[in-house]
Structures are given as structure tokens and as C-alpha cells.
């Protein structure tokens, strides 16, 4: 009977050691998973920073800085405004003369709709 009790005790002790080993293995697996996740996150962050640096270099190379863009827009705007001012100065007198002609030189004539209506009804002979 003592050997049975001793055998049971050995089985229980072996089962306890097996459960402890399984728990330790689970803890190690969980730790490795966390570490792998942290390493992957660090790698993703490093790649993201690398791509942002490449984009900024590309943007700098092909687009220039914001100040360059701003000064180019300002120059273009000033050029367009000066062109418009020259156009106004060159055409100002002709526009004034044309407006005065239209306002002062009145040529009374019938409206074309009235003329058409009279032609259709036969009341007007041209």
C-alpha cells in the first residue's frame, strides 16, 4: 500500500512539474510574441521615417521650398497685374471714344423685332 501511495505521490509530483513547465512555456511564448510585436512596430516606424525623409527630399528637389513657391506666385501675379495695367493704358482712350460714340451718336431706328412683326403681318413695306 505504501508503494501505491508513493506511486500516486510521484504521479502527482510529475503532473505538477508538467503543469509548471507548460505554464513556463506559455509565459516564454507570450514574452516572445510581445518582443516580436515590439520589434515589428519599431521596424514599421523606422520604415515610415525613412519614407517620409525620401518624400521630403523628393519634394524639396522637384517642388522647392514653400518660400520659393510663394515668391514664384508673387512674381507671376505681379507680372499679370502689370500686363493688365499696360493693356488698360493702351486701350483706355479707344474705349472712352467708343463709349462716347455709342452714347452721343444716336441713330433712331425701329427695333428688329418690330420690323419682323410688321413684315409678317404685311403692315410694313420696306
UniProtKB/Swiss-Prot annotation:
Q: Does the keyword Transport apply?
A: yes
Reported consequences of knocking out the gene: Suppression of necrotic cell death. RNAi-mediated knockdown results in increased germ cell corpse number due to delayed clearance of dying or dead cells, impaired phagosome maturation at a late stage and impaired acidification of phagosomes containing cell corpses.
Instruction: Report keywords, A-Z.
Output: Hydrogen ion transport, Ion transport, Transport
Disulfide bond residue pairs: none
Q: Give me any GO biological process, just one.
A: positive regulation of programmed cell death
An example of a Gene Ontology cellular component annotation for this protein is: vacuolar proton-transporting V-type ATPase, V1 domain
Q: Does the entry feature the keyword NAD, yes or no?
A: no
Q: Name one GO molecular function term.
A: proton-transporting ATPase activity, rotational mechanism
Signal peptide interval: none
Per its UniProt record, what InterPro entries does this chain match? V-ATPase_G (IPR005124)
Q: Which Pfam families match?
A: V-ATPase_G
* Functional note: Subunit of the V1 complex of vacuolar(H+)-ATPase (V-ATPase), a multisubunit enzyme composed of a peripheral complex (V1) that hydrolyzes ATP and a membrane integral complex (V0) that translocates protons. V-ATPase is responsible for acidifying and maintaining the pH of intracellular compartments and in some cell types, is targeted to the plasma membrane, where it is responsible for acidifying the extracellular environment. In neurons, required for necrotic cell death by promoting intracellular acidification.
Q: Which family does it belong to?
A: Belongs to the V-ATPase G subunit family.
> What is the protein's quaternary organization?
V-ATPase is a heteromultimeric enzyme made up of two complexes: the ATP-hydrolytic V1 complex and the proton translocation V0 complex. The V1 complex consists of three catalytic AB heterodimers that form a heterohexamer, three peripheral stalks each consisting of EG heterodimers, one central rotor including subunits D and F, and the regulatory subunits C and H. The proton translocation complex V0 consists of the proton transport subunit a, a ring of proteolipid subunits c9c'', rotary subunit d, subunits e and f, and the accessory subunits vah-19/Ac45 and vah-20/PRR. Interacts with ced-1.
Q: What protein name applies here?
A: Probable V-type proton ATPase subunit G
Q: What's the source species for this entry?
A: Caenorhabditis elegans
The gene designation is vha-10
Amino acid at each position: 500500500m505504501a508503494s501505491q501511495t508513493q506511486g500516486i505521490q510521484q504521479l502527482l509530483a510529475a503532473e505538477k512539474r508538467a503543469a509548471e513547465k507548460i505554464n513556463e512555456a506559455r509565459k516564454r511564448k507570450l514574452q516572445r510574441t510581445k518582443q516580436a510585436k515590439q520589434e515589428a512596430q519599431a521596424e514599421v516606424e523606422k520604415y515610415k521615417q525613412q519614407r517620409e525623409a525620401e518624400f521630403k527630399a523628393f519634394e524639396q528637389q522637384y517642388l522647392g521650398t514653400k518660400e520659393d513657391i510663394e515668391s514664384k506666385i508673387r512674381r507671376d501675379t505681379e507680372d499679370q497685374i502689370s500686363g493688365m495695367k499696360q493693356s488698360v493704358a493702351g486701350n483706355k482712350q479707344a474705349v472712352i471714344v467708343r463709349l462716347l460714340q455709342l452714347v452721343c451718336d444716336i441713330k433712331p431706328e425701329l427695333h428688329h423685332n418690330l420690323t419682323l412683326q410688321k413684315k409678317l403681318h404685311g403692315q410694313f413695306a420696306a
